[in-house]
């Protein structure tokens, strides 16, 4: 600056000169410049975190890199929501990677609280065996009770037995009959895997967790988020009251449509449950093949009517 003046020596009436507005090294005043009681102009405190601008009281005293490299710093940042987004992403990546080559599978749900000598445990075990005989892998929540029974049946039938565990304060770890296990922190990531890698649900008697998985599947089918996804309830005595209530109260009051009650089937027979799933899958496979054939025929017909540019030139 001319005359050897400096910013510190300038009077309050003299604005700081901008030697080179295009030079990033030259500090530029902003619209947020403020004058204190002495008349000096100060820059507002401002930092950037990616697309986020922070000023004044929102400015952090340390940088992201500094906190990363300072091993003596606090560690509670790993529990902040932005970090959780990365953790959630990692759960989807791990789940997709582990299950991508699974092949045909069915998710089986039911209570974690039944004993191994109960009729429901035997029922779950038979469901697992029948699914393997029909060519399906068995996916469960990986826990005890019905989940263990279905995994055990699949394992004993020399099939693929999958467990998708969840971090809970009171649950046991992955049961011993799981051959391929993936653990999750977040329910929604885990439930995505149950639907994405299964060709249907078989639901045995269970509690709130079972109801959650059942009604999420029904909602996804009802809203066409998934198509041709068979849901089979096993245990007419257990599920009958719920089905009656859906018909006599929910349907009667117009809160669901008549066709919504056809989104699931009810049986006592594990063999029939697997047959329902298999037939629904075969029907859907034929529909997809027919749709592909019709689409190819329509494309061919349009091409014949319009003619290719090359064909037109040859005729001339």
Language-model segments: which ranges?
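Short, positively charged and aromatic/hydrophobic N-terminal segments
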Residues: 5-9
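C-terminal functional extensions of proteins
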Residues: 15, 233-316
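Solvent-exposed alpha-helices and their adjacent loops that cap or buttress functional pockets
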Residues: 99-101, 130-132, 154-155, 172-176, ...
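Generic secondary-structure signature for well-ordered alpha-helical cores
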Residues: 94, 98, 136, 155-159, ...
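Glycine-rich beta-alpha loop segments
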Residues: 11-18, 29-166, 173
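Short gly/pro/ser/thr-enriched loop/turn and capping motifs at secondary-structure boundaries
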Residues: 167-173, 210, 238-241
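Active-site/ligand-binding-proximal alpha/beta "capping" segment
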Residues: 185-237, 281-286
């Amino acid at each position: 600056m001319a005359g050897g003046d400096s910013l510190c020596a300038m009077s309050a009436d003299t604005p700081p000169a901008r030697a080179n507005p295009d030079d990033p090294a030259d500090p530029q005043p902003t619209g947020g410049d403020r004058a204190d009681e002495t008349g000096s102009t100060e820059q507002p405190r401002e930092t950037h975190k990616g697309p986020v601008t922070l000023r004044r009281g929102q400015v952090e005293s340390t940088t992201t890199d500094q906190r990363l490299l300072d091993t003596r710093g606090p560690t509670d940042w790993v529990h902040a929501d932005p970090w959780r987004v990365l953790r959630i992403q990692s759960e989807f990546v791990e789940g997709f990677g582990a299950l991508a080559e699974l092949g045909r599978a069915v998710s089986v749900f039911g209570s974690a609280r039944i004993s191994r000598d109960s009729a429901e445990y035997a029922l779950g075990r038979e469901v697992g065996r029948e699914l393997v005989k029909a060519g399906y892998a068995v996916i469960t929540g990986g826990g005890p009770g019905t989940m263990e029974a279905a995994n055990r049946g699949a394992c004993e039938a020399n099939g693929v037995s999958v467990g998708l565990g969840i971090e809970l304060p009171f649950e046991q770890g992955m049961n011993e009959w799981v051959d391929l296990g993936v653990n999750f922190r977040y329910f929604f990531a885990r439930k995505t895997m149950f639907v994405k890698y299964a060709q249907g649900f078989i639901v045995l008697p269970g509690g709130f967790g079972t109801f959650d998985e059942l009604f999420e599947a029904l909602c996804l089918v009802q809203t066409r988020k998934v198509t041709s996804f068979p849901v089979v309830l096993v245990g007419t005595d257990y599920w009958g009251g719920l089905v009656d209530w859906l018909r006599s109260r929910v349907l009667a009051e117009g809160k669901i449509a008549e066709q919504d009650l056809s989104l699931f089937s009810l049986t006592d027979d594990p063999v029939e449950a697997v047959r329902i799933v298999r037939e629904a899958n075969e029907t859907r496979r034929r529909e997809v093949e027919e749709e592909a054939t019709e689409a190819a025929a329509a494309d061919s017909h349009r091409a014949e009517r319009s003619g290719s540019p090359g064909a037109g030139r040859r005729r001339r």
